[in-house]
Each structure stands twice: as C-alpha cells, then as structure tokens.
Amino acid sequence: WRDGSDYKEVLGYKPEKAWIATDGKTIIPNHYDLIRSNNLSISSCGKKMYSVDEMYKRVFECTVDKNGYLINPNVIIEEGDYCVRNIKDNILVGDDDIKIYKNGKIVKSIHVASRPSTFDIGGTNKDTLFITARDGIYVAKIDLEENDE
C-alpha cells in the first residue's frame, strides 16, 4: 500500500501486458494498482478523463492519448473522495456533499443526509442524480444547463 504521494505517476503508468475482453474490443490493462480503484470512468482517445486521489482529496484531469494511456495529469480541484464525473462540462465531485464545478468554481452543492459514496447521472433527460451513500440511495433532480455562464 502506497502513501499516495506518487498518484500522478501512477496515473501515467504504462503496463507491459493487457488482456482483450470477451467483446473483442475492450482492452484491460494489467495494472498493478487497479485493485485500489473503486470508481472507473469512461473516456475516449483525445478526450479528458478525471480521477480522484482519495488520500490527498484532490481531482486530477488527464488526457487520454491515441494509445489509451493517461497523459498530462494535473490537479484541478483540491477536494474529492471516491467519485468524479464530467457531465455537460460540469465537474461533479463527491466528498462530504456533491459539489458541482464549472470553470474551476463551485456553482452548486447537493447535500444528502449521509456521506455519498458514488453517484451518476441518469433519467430520460439526463437530469437525475442517483447517489449511493452509507445508509441508502438518494435521488436528486439537477439542471446542469442553468450553470452555464
């Protein structure tokens, strides 16, 4: 178990081995530290990917290169625990509450009765936030469009 001070290096780790999933398309890297992850994000080559360093409570933004590796990790938010999502250019970060950031600034905070563990967006109009917490599941309606500047 590491102390987390090498999180930036771990994000850019390039494994020598990988497996092909049963769909014949998905690559699963043989990553020595994947077992520590509790929340994986989906991204595409050339796009941004976000990861939370839970030990030091900070969010990293990386770019996915043409080979699927994470490059240029930078801290963009100095808080976070467990889960981060980029939805309509809003960065949602779970910690004591779920905070919504736009252009590096908090625009909204969603409080639930118990500390959130994970969350994701859903619903027909992608306006429903589903939150798992230590004592239950919560649902919140959100309007991310109203946060546009």
Question: What are the functions of these language-model segments?
Answer:
Residues 21-28, 66-74, 105-108, 146-149:
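Beta-strand initiation motifs
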Residues 1-5, 54, 64, 95-96, ...:
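Short loop/turn segments immediately following the C-termini of beta-strands
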Residues 41-62, 66-73:
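Glycine- and Gly-Pro-enriched alpha-helical subdomains that act as flexible
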Residues 9-10, 14-17, 146-149:
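Predominantly five- to eight-bladed beta-propeller fold
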Residues 16-20, 58-60, 97-99, 136:
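A short loop-to-beta-strand structural motif that recurs across blades of beta-propeller domains
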Residues 20-23, 53, 63, 101-102, ...:
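Structural recognition of the beta-propeller blade-terminating site
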Residues 118-149:
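Blade-level signature of beta-propeller repeat domains, shared across WD40, Kelch, NHL, RCC1
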Residues 1-4, 12-18, 29-48, 74-95, ...:
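Beta-rich, blade/repeat-based domains predominating
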